[in-house]
Amino acid sequence: MIKKYRKTKETEISVELEICGSGNAEIDTGIGFFDHMLESFTKHSLIDLKLICKGDLNVDFHHSVEDCGIVLGSALREAIYPIKKIERFGDSVVVMDEAAFSCALDLSNRAFLVFEGPKVGKVGEFDIELLEEFFRAVAFNAGITLHLIKLRGQNLHHLSEAAFKSFAVALRRALSKNERAEIPSTKGIL
């Protein structure tokens, strides 16, 4: 179990994470739609996650969403590295009605993000541009090379959920045990 805590003038966040979990979630960010996305992530990654965030929501959701990505990414980094006996690479395509999202990732300990998804609009009060901010914060703090690409769809709720679920499934696959892959790199270290 990895525990992380971060407090700034804008947010206070605590995370408890178990990557070998069963998808249990206890999420409270004060942002209902974001909570729903994080619950979808835990369910489909099979990671147990407790994430509590108190943020300056009266200003904007940006600080809370990005900072949750920072702390979650930091917890993932601690849980994942050093890598031994796992697949390392993962990919998935997830559909939700008319929406389809693709995710490919590498637990490379090298941070990179390609995000080709919706950037304008809202789901309720949630600015859709925050999706990219969240995934960037996760990727850069976890040391993940992450490619998330919209394949089709218009409904912003469906697209968002497909993106989170696709990331979850790809991460679950990358974390899958592979007893033959002592260190899955020709460098001998990740």
Swiss-Prot record:
<dbReference type="InterPro" id="IPR020568">
    <property type="entry name" value="Ribosomal_Su5_D2-typ_SF"/>
</dbReference>
<dbReference type="GO" id="GO:0004424">
    <property type="term" value="F:imidazoleglycerol-phosphate dehydratase activity"/>
</dbReference>
<keyword id="KW-0028">Amino-acid biosynthesis</keyword>
<dbReference type="InterPro" id="IPR020565">
    <property type="entry name" value="ImidazoleglycerP_deHydtase_CS"/>
</dbReference>
<protein>
    <recommendedName>
        <fullName>Imidazoleglycerol-phosphate dehydratase</fullName>
        <ecNumber>4.2.1.19</ecNumber>
    </recommendedName>
</protein>
<dbReference type="InterPro" id="IPR038494">
    <property type="entry name" value="IGPD_sf"/>
</dbReference>
<keyword id="KW-0963">Cytoplasm</keyword>
<dbReference type="GO" id="GO:0005737">
    <property type="term" value="C:cytoplasm"/>
</dbReference>
<dbReference type="GO" id="GO:0000105">
    <property type="term" value="P:L-histidine biosynthetic process"/>
</dbReference>
<comment type="similarity">
    <text>Belongs to the imidazoleglycerol-phosphate dehydratase family.</text>
</comment>
<comment type="pathway">
    <text>Amino-acid biosynthesis; L-histidine biosynthesis; L-histidine from 5-phospho-alpha-D-ribose 1-diphosphate: step 6/9.</text>
</comment>
<dbReference type="InterPro" id="IPR000807">
    <property type="entry name" value="ImidazoleglycerolP_deHydtase"/>
</dbReference>
<keyword id="KW-0368">Histidine biosynthesis</keyword>
<dbReference type="Pfam" id="PF00475">
    <property type="entry name" value="IGPD"/>
</dbReference>
<keyword id="KW-0456">Lyase</keyword>
